[in-house]
Design a protein with these regions (language model features):
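Gly/Gly-Pro-rich "capping" loops immediately C-terminal to redox-active cysteine motifs
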Residues: 37, 41, 57-84
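Bacterial N-terminal signal peptides that target proteins for export
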Residues: 2-14
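Electrostatic cytochrome c docking/interface patches
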Residues: 25-43
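Axial heme c-ligation environment in periplasmic c-type cytochrome domains
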Residues: 64, 71, 90-120
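Stable alpha-helical elements in mature extracytoplasmic
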Residues: 36, 44, 83, 87, ...
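Bacterial N-terminal signal peptides
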Residues: 12-22
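The canonical Cys-X-X-Cys-His
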Residues: 40, 44-54, 98, 113, ...
Length: 122
């Protein structure tokens, strides 16, 4: 069968799939190597510690005044339920009182921070 745009069903499905994947895919991850986790720690200390705290519990000096409270990265259940893609999106775009880091941190730096915050729940 041909669609109204002149595509047969198979070509239409392939084209639609490519378009869908290209608009929803998250950029390539940085590997959670010890080196990248260490770099993520340095970035976390510079950009995240004031709200999320030194131990990732969301109890940093600036975080105490925020509502809702910053995410507690030590909550093993919550962290296990979070996908890397979802956390990366929240770091990138921000959420609630948390600012977006899309323009403040490079993509690989955001992945490094993500890998570091995962260490709090281990």
């Amino acid at each position: 069968m041909t669609t109204r745009f002149g595509f047969n069903d198979a070509r239409f499905i392939v084209l639609a799939s490519v378009l869908l994947l290209s608009t929803t895919a998250v950029a390539q991850k940085v590997e959670p190597s010890p080196e990248n986790i260490s770099k993520g720690e340095a970035i976390y200390k510079k950009h995240c510690l004031m709200c999320h705290g030194a131990t990732g519990m969301g109890d940093g000096p600036a975080g105490k005044r925020l509502n809702p409270k910053p995410y507690n990265f030590q909550d093993k259940e919550k962290m296990a339920a979070e996908t890397d893609e979802h956390l990366f999106k929240e770091i990138t775009k921000g959420k609630g009182p948390m600012p977006a880091f899309e323009r403040k941190l490079k993509e690989d730096e955001r992945w490094m921070v993500l890998h570091y915050i995962r260490t709090f729940a281990k």
